[in-house]
Amino acid sequence: MLGAALRRCAVAATTWAGPRGLLHSSRTPGPAAAIQSVRCYSHGSHETDEEFDARWVTYFNKPDIDAWELRKGINTLVTYDLVPEPKIIDAALRACRRLNDFASTVRILEAVKDKAGPHKEIYPYVIQELRPTLNELGISTPEELGLDKV
């Protein structure tokens, strides 16, 4: 279906209206018209929860991580259909601190609260697990900053 739509678009882009309002092809359709539908299946091995956690902790613990990589990692992590483990969030908060990026720390904590959704017990658990790190790094939660009332 997508291939047919792309072929129609490619043909439409190469036609023009003649004197009687008829469409005339100025050239033959290009390679975009030859697109065929392809089925992509994942035949690779699946990543375990421990491997997933280790990958993200390693990513945020890179000593040379810059602000762009930090935001890219946070954005990618937020797109997953899960609430990150506290050890991943801990590594991300420490990366924010190394870069002196306080705004990203608040954004991470707000994203965790949002990802928890209707499960009200998840966010307090994560904050409880992160409390030593938050105190060590001098990071306030969005609730402590009054951002939950805005």
UniProtKB/Swiss-Prot annotation:
Gene that this polypeptide is encoded by: COX5A
Described by its record, this protein's role is as follows: Component of the cytochrome c oxidase, the last enzyme in the mitochondrial electron transport chain which drives oxidative phosphorylation. The respiratory chain contains 3 multisubunit complexes succinate dehydrogenase (complex II, CII), ubiquinol-cytochrome c oxidoreductase (cytochrome b-c1 complex, complex III, CIII) and cytochrome c oxidase (complex IV, CIV), that cooperate to transfer electrons derived from NADH and succinate to molecular oxygen, creating an electrochemical gradient over the inner membrane that drives transmembrane transport and the ATP synthase.
One GO cellular component, as annotated: mitochondrial inner membrane
Q: What is this protein called?
A: Cytochrome c oxidase subunit 5A, mitochondrial
**Positions of modified residues (Phosphothreonine):** 141
Pfam families per the UniProt record, alphabetical = COX5A
Family as reported in the entry's similarity comment: Belongs to the cytochrome c oxidase subunit 5A family.
Question: Motif span (SIFI-degron)?
Answer: 2-17
The protein's topology relative to the membrane is: Peripheral membrane protein
One GO BP on record is: mitochondrial electron transport, cytochrome c to oxygen
Lineage summary: Eukaryota, Metazoa, Chordata, Craniata, Vertebrata
Swiss-Prot/TrEMBL keywords:
Acetylation, Heme, Iron, Membrane, Metal-binding, Mitochondrion, Mitochondrion inner membrane, Phosphoprotein, Transit peptide, Ubl conjugation
